[in-house]
């Protein structure tokens, strides 16, 4: 799509929270420092805590120093950015706040030429979404005022199919779908975007991207950290809700989708939805065949002893919450019929890593060995984080007088090739929202399909009669039962 730079105002509701401090303002600063943020712009922070505009600016200065990818080169540059920051205190449940926000926006817009473009960011707990959406509608702030008006909503988008539909209904009563941006920061990561370029801009890969050549796909999102201070939240969520429903299913759809007509929001969302429709529904009677859950116990991470999940603050001593989840999904269409997609995510794993591994079939006839098992099949690994890049393994002759084969890797690393670290995901996604490009956001129907797919698993795990989650040692790659889970197809989990 064509991008034009116009003035805009961003209102961050929940500006005193961690998301604003660690991600949003650092991303906005990095965009400004890189001269990619449209100007003139204004950023209005709002939260319950009382603070002056100067106090807010000082806090954001400390935030940028600590968390931004790009550090302020000089006070002059920072001062120019800070002059666009302001603060409006208030309770998001109080209609009076929205009158104050309207007045602040009108003052900013009246002092500069150009349309009144407004972007609202819900950086609050999801429990406040309904209240905020309702107040934005009742106050008239949701209606465009001579420019565009948009809203960004953070995950989780509900906690099941019913609540997701309710949230979409609340949003739809106030905003049009093209005004709504449901953010999944994984889609803003450089390597995730490069997945589509890899597929559709290189003729060597797309002909192999099907059941005739691909034996299996593994998608891993592992975290070395535990629940930290989020024990109470995690008790209500769990790994399946927190990570699988959004991040991993989005990655699956990007990997499995057909080529869109153009790389624009509508065609891309349509193709991702076709994948969701093609995923084989989960039979409630066969949950154990397609899903497995685990929970971390005590262990060692980087040589330090750590407590198990049930010993974390805010967690019930008899909790059955999943901190590890694995799925085996099948995509029943012409391209992927019979190819298993294995998805796994967990906390307190051996290390922090996110990757997609595409394992290809073995050669149909190995002429170099009588036993073809001596040569590993080709594998393409797309590393999402850390150390963004790609690696392709191929068979090659090892040096020496005898004909012996070994596996070698062709490795591409972003930092080495481009000489700079990739931008943070929020930088790309915030800029896309300003430019009206929702390609890397989630659409309402996709969100509901994802919850509908996982509903049988969530229902089964919620039953009192359900088995306890399998325990795994903190610092490991998950429960031992997960290896039996994948070995039923003759496979094995990769060790990233």
Question: Where do the protein language model's features map onto the residues?
Answer:
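Secretory/organelle targeting and membrane-embedding segments
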Residues: 1-153, 157-496
